């Protein structure tokens, strides 16, 4: 029985090491690159003394951020993602709430850490992702891991003014991904188009099945969601066939006549949520891509 989400990555590395796992317009990481960088980060965090504690990941949305998440898990810790799109006060409250001693940053965020008042150890991704991995250390950490260990804490929007952390743990994530994948029919040929920020739990629908099946996830630029035609062209350019989006993003495409200009050529699986899908817009989607399945 699988007890650790890292098994998804390790099993896939054995099968398709050089296949693209995560990509955006600027960079891409293969499964072996995700594995190697994550293990290096895990080794560095362990050397720094991190274990069974939160590690904040303060990076822009990119493939390397996802590798950092799994580096934190390799260290036996749990990741807490924050993003420069968040209001500064929100990030400060998250840091106060977690009382984290470690933070991973990249070039885009390094000059913004001081403003958050973080007083712990800040590690640059560019350096710790190149640390020589120590398999002996990582094996020892794994031997002490349990399926009830936390792997992330993601914070809600904070309707009361104070963000609240939601904990994900190995067993819960594994059970969810196994069930979701069975229903939606993911496989090695799945190409996801990610919409949501990496600090929201909605991105789990793409990140973990990608590792499980050796699929591919494209991180779609936020700017695309302002221009429906450009968005559909992005889907076509990268042969994206599966999306798990909020209804408002789907409506933005259908309601503005986008299908008169361009239609999604490869989409066959569309999972939607967050609100009711208006019948008129839903029918437009169904008529445009009649062979697609909607969930």
PLM regions: where:
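Carrier-protein-dependent adenylate-forming modules in NRPS/ANL systems
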Residues: 1-172, 184-185, 214
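ATP-dependent adenylate-forming carboxylate-activation enzymes
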Residues: 59-63, 77-93, 107-109, 215-238, ...
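Short, Asp-centered acidic motifs that coordinate Mg2+ and/or phosphate
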Residues: 93, 101-102, 191, 241-242, ...
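Conserved AMP-binding/adenylation subdomain of ANL enzymes
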Residues: 164-193, 201-241
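Gly/Ser/Thr-rich phosphate-binding loop
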Residues: 212-215, 240-244, 254-295
């Amino acid at each position: 029985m699988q007890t650790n989400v890292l098994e998804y990555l390790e099993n896939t590395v054995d099968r398709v090491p050089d296949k693209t796992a995560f990509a955006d317009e600027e960079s891409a990481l293969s499964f072996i690159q995700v594995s190697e960088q994550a293990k290096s980060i895990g080794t560095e965090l362990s050397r720094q003394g991190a274990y069974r504690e939160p590690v904040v990941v303060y990076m822009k949305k990119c493939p390397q951020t996802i590798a950092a998440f799994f580096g934190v898990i390799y260290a036996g810790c749990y990741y807490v993602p924050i993003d420069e799109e968040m209001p500064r006060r929100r990030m400060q409250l998250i840091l106060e709430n977690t009382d984290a001693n470690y933070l991973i940053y990249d070039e885009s965020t390094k000059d913004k850490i001081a403003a958050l008042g973080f007083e712990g150890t800040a590690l640059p991704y560019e350096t710790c992702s190149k640390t020589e991995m120590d398999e002996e250390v990582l094996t020892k950490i794994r031997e002490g891991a349990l399926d009830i260990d936390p792997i992330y804490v993601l914070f809600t929007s904070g309707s009361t003014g104070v963000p609240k952390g939601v904990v994900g743990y190995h067993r819960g994530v594994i059970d969810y991904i196994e069930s979701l994948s069975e229903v939606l029919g993911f496989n090695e040929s799945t190409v996801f188009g990610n919409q949501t920020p990496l600090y929201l739990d909605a991105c789990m629908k793409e990140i973990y099945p990608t590792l499980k099946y050796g699929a591919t996830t494209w991180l779609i630029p936020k700017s695309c969601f302002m221009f429906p035609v450009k968005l559909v062209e992005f889907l076509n350019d990268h042969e994206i066939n599966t999306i798990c989006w909020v209804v408002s993003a789907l409506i933005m495409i259908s309601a503005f006549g986008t299908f008169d200009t361009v239609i999604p050529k490869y989409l066959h699986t569309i999972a939607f949520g967050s609100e009711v899908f208006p019948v008129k817009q839903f029918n437009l989607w169904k008529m445009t891509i009649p062979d697609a399945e909607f969930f």
